[in-house]
């Protein structure tokens, strides 16, 4: 195997280790914060942290279990019996099991001098599922936790060291999850264009810079009006859920479980853009962007008209220039990325494809695993080229 290929396998393995470590670090930070709140007598804050953790974990395990059940029989080879897997997910360990499975397969492939096509394809299959689950966990748990911690800090006027650790890990974790998801989608393209260093930095930064004003707007509103933030979230979330439903998503294996996906996507859309349907992607992205921007402006107007000071005595005017600066810089980087660095490709129909595996056989005569869930999303995320061949690799 060429050194470049072995280097790519090692890079994927290292990124897998870092992703798993980041998940455990984020989990530990949240539990640490909950314990500190409880020890300080702030039981409501501790309960909110644990509730967000619990709800996100249950959703994550449901996704993982439903996907395992939908995968073709024999795809995962030697794995624990279904009852053991069900117990792992019931104990909220299904995601970690998948992480261990991915790392083990990645290490196996890297150690082989000439890994088989099946082993390489199976490693990609596992990594794609992990990337999607990580994205779900990020917006179901990390983004709400970040908003909660910021609201607590702004309301109390003081920041503990564990809160600063949580804020830093949350912002980096969210941006990294979006970058990893985008990188994973690129592996589903026919030409498999890699996300270069420059493209990665720009994609990471514009997500971070656009996320900060949104989280700050909601956190400041929560600090000023803690009794109304749940109503605000529910109202917007229902509108976004209706929008997702109208787009006719078909990501999950059956119609009943599709609602779990729609509920999750609506939560993601509350914080950031997420494409779920083919067609006028740019138009839908602009509509969503204008919707979130209008909502954030309304939140800012609410601060200004009701109070110019936070309960902690911090003037709100200090935060507005920071949020505006991040917003315009993030918007500029986003335009740069989508104008010059976003790839397009030609998707050729594959009517003979069965769920979870390519219909074409490898030279050895067995089917190569293909993660159709992520391939389906990639077909929606990336524009189609006008010519018959994939466009030149960008970034």
UniProtKB/Swiss-Prot annotation:
Pfam families: XK-related. The modification Phosphothreonine is found at residue 375. InterPro entries: XK-rel, XK-related_scramblase. Phosphorylation at Thr-375 activates the phospholipid scramblase activity. Residues 34-47, 180-200, 245-259, 306-312 are extracellular. One of its GO terms (molecular function) is phospholipid scramblase activity. Keywords: Apoptosis, Cell membrane, Cytoplasm, Membrane, Phosphoprotein, Transmembrane, Transmembrane helix. The modification Phosphoserine is found at residue 362. The record marks 355-356 as: Cleavage. One of its GO terms (cellular component) is perinuclear region of cytoplasm. Activated upon caspase cleavage to generate the XK-related protein 8, processed form. Does not act prior the onset of apoptosis. One of its GO terms (biological process) is phosphatidylserine exposure on apoptotic cell surface. It is found in: Cell membrane; Cytoplasm, Perinuclear region. Residues 1-12, 69-158, 222-223, 278-284, 334-395 are cytoplasmic. The chain crosses the membrane at residues 13-33, 48-68, 159-179, 201-221, 224-244, 260-277, 285-305, 313-333. (Microbial infection) Incorporated into Ebola virus-like particles, where its phospholipid scramblase activity is required to promote phosphatidylserine exposure on the surface of viral particles. Externalization of phosphatidylserine on the surface of viral particles is required for uptake by host cells. Expression is repressed in PLB-985 leukemia and Raji lymphoma cells due to CpG methylation near the transcription start site of XKR8 gene, possibly explaining the inability of PLB-985 leukemia and Raji lymphoma cells to expose phosphatidylserine during apoptosis. Belongs to the XK family. This is XK-related protein 8. It comes from Homo sapiens.
